[in-house]
């Protein structure tokens, strides 16, 4: 690629190969002090191979990056990103799902209000419980995104083993999804992966990937949760044994397609990956959507903490968002049948 061609892009553009910067256009050179031809590419940009799109932090600011693999290397097109509240399509989807759930509550309680039944049990209990968990999940998502848009979202900072967090999530989700014929496998590194962050938030971000993948395998199959490290970055991905999502489907997961669709009744409100992206941003990481055909859909990436004695700034613990209920059941409530959720209900 000639420099003249690179300068024709209206946004900052960087061409790199083998983790080294080959060229930057004039806009990128003016914007980034640390990126120049011959220098090292920031680790977050090569934490995931292939073509992808996502929001990352570069020199202290958030940018929307689209990476495209070309013959001469990978081209990165960079756009400044503004903090925003729920997107219009996401808000429509959330309100649509809330109306559906309120209708479910009315239908499930109507026979008792009319005196036709006097004991709340059996299938009615199962459906009511499932609707309750789904409503709780929806409210959790909207609450977190609202706080993030207002700049009021904070994370506890504690030392965590990301390998352990992933292993526990795979075990807990596997025990639940096993009843649907879905097996969850975990593949991680040989040792611990130390990170600094909020364990509950990171767990919930991971559960969004598992939940989305489980929806694709409702008739059974295998989900594979993998954790790997490259340099000072950790990378998490969840895949299944079915066909990989198309590029259009993957962009639709984050509501960034040309015509984002409001999810159907059993597809959630479409907020899950936005929540995961918000959590990763809060931890200095990113949610990256692989745009290549046949590639896994979504990655979570974040920096590891290898330095001992690192100084941490501690925050006051935030509110417990799951009302003390099983977070794995909440995350999978759009996927699991009612009888499986009922077992966790305590009167």
Regions of interest found by a model, annotated:
Residues 1-28, 94-96, 103, 147, ...:
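Sensory modules in modular signal-transduction proteins
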Residues 150-155, 194-197:
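Conserved micro-motifs of the catalytic ATP-binding
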Residues 156-171:
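A conserved beta-strand-to-alpha-helix junction within the catalytic ATP-binding
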Residues 222-232:
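Short beta-strand/loop element within the Bergerat-fold HATPase_c
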Residues 265-275:
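Glycine-rich phosphate-binding loop
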Residues 284-285:
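Conserved glycine-rich
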């Amino acid at each position: 690629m000639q420099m003249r061609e690179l300068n024709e892009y209206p946004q900052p553009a960087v061409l790199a190969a083998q983790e080294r910067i080959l060229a930057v256009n004039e806009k990128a050179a003016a914007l980034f002090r640390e990126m120049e031809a011959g220098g090292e590419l920031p680790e977050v940009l090569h934490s995931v191979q292939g073509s992808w799109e996502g929001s990352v932090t570069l020199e202290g600011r958030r940018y929307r990056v689209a990476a495209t693999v070309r013959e001469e290397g990978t081209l990165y097109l960079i756009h400044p990103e503004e903090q925003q509240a729920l997107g219009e399509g996401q808000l429509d989807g959330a309100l649509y799902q809330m109306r559906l759930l309120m209708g479910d509550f009315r239908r499930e309680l109507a026979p008792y209000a009319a005196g036709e039944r006097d004991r709340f049990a059996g299938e009615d209990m199962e459906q009511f419980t499932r609707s309750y968990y789904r409503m709780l999940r929806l409210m959790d998502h909207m609450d977190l995104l609202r706080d993030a848009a207002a700049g009021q979202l904070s994370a506890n900072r504690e030392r965590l083993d990301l390998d352990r967090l992933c292993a526990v999530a795979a075990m807990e989700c596997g025990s639940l999804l096993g009843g649907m014929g879905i097996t969850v496998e975990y593949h991680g590194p040989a040792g611990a992966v130390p990170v600094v962050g909020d364990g509950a938030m990171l767990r919930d971000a991971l559960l969004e990937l598992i939940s989305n993948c489980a929806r694709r395998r409702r008739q059974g199959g295998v989900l594979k949760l993998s954790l790997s490290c490259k340099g000072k970055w950790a990378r998490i991905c969840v895949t299944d044994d079915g066909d990989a999502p198309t590029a259009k489907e993957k962009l639709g997961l984050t509501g960034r397609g040309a015509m984002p669709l409001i999810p159907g009744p059993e597809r959630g409100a479409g907020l899950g990956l936005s929540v995961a992206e918000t959590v990763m941003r809060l931890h200095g990481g990113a949610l990256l959507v692989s745009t290549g055909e046949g590639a896994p859909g979504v990655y979570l990436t974040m920096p590891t903490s290898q330095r001992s004695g690192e100084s941490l700034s501690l925050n006051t613990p935030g509110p417990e968002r799951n009302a003390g209920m099983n977070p794995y059941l909440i995350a999978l409530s759009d996927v699991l049948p009612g009888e499986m959720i009922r077992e966790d209900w305590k009167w």
